């Protein structure tokens, strides 16, 4: 097993809290069939970067609430994604039979909330009409049409929720920019962009929001780069681009 950091935020106690996915390999070789099995929470001193505490998250499930984290006004919002991307189903438009994402869940992003900075308490979940304690009632909140994989990251810019999604992860080429007045929508796609791969054997994946370097009219995202066979290490450096804030 290994642990994969997700989203995080400064808590009410002044510590940086980072959600972490516990990953399990069920096959006999690396990335043959990987499954997230639990969510953990790690508290870090933001000045010394020392780990203060680590424990099972208040929602410790494999739903991975904490995939993306954003605070706004009275609440901190925890977005969820199943993150099943190795050894599941073949990509529909590819001739390869290699198992990749789990198409039963990878388009869905749900959201929960806690009081602002209280990442140590059990969240409540958006069921399409109201917030509820029933995690099983949570509904997808990010647009899914034409998107097999939604590894969405969310931020608040100018009192609006901004969602950045590298559609279809390492199989896709488009990055969708959506904005909404609330953490659950309704979302409007205001932009689509493409960051070119660095070589014929390369791809791009996972667009993340960089919390610095933006102007009054733009914000910054970093796009990860990959080489299909993993040989060309210099291609791994992220591409950083500025994108417009919706008018």
Task: Give residue spans per PLM region.
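Beta-rich carbohydrate-recognition and catalytic domains
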Residues: 1, 10-60, 77-149, 155-199, ...
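Glycine-centered flexibility motif
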Residues: 61-66, 74
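Beta-propeller and closely related beta-sheet repeat lectin domains
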Residues: 1-9, 65-69, 150-153, 205-211
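Short hydrophobic/aromatic beta-strand or adjacent loop that forms the aromatic wall/cage
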Residues: 204-206, 237-238
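Extracellular glycan/ECM-engagement signal in secreted proteins
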Residues: 207, 217-218
